[in-house]
Amino acid sequence: MSKQCDVCGKKAQVGHHVSHSNIKTKRRFEPNLQSVRHQYPNGEVKTLSVCTRCLRSGAVVKPAVRKVA
């Protein structure tokens, strides 16, 4: 599973750890991805890796929850 949002395409960025003595070492900033079940307009349901920004903006439609009898 790649560290990339399936909706907006957001992926890891490169930056630095900066120590007290100002020594810089490489690091990665990973997006906050969540696994979410998404329902397409034709009724198909798939699991997507979605960043929290897309979740909050409503870019993903969650399927209706069925009640178990």
Swiss-Prot record:
One of its GO terms (biological process) is translation. Gene3D superfamilies: Ribosomal protein L28/L24. It comes from the Bacteria. GO terms for molecular function: structural constituent of ribosome. The keyword Ligase does not apply. InterPro entries: Bacterial_rp_bL28, Ribosomal_bL28, Ribosomal_bL28/bL31-like_sf, Ribosomal_bL28_bact-type, Ribosomal_bL28_sf. Keywords: Ribonucleoprotein, Ribosomal protein. The keyword Ribonucleoprotein applies. Pfam families: Ribosomal_L28 (PF00830). One of its GO terms (cellular component) is ribosome. Belongs to the bacterial ribosomal protein bL28 family. PANTHER family: 50S RIBOSOMAL PROTEIN L28, LARGE RIBOSOMAL SUBUNIT PROTEIN BL28A. This is Large ribosomal subunit protein bL28. It comes from Nitratidesulfovibrio vulgaris (strain DSM 19637 / Miyazaki F) (Desulfovibrio vulgaris). The lineage of its organism: Bacteria, Pseudomonadati, Thermodesulfobacteriota, Desulfovibrionia, Desulfovibrionales. The gene is rpmB.
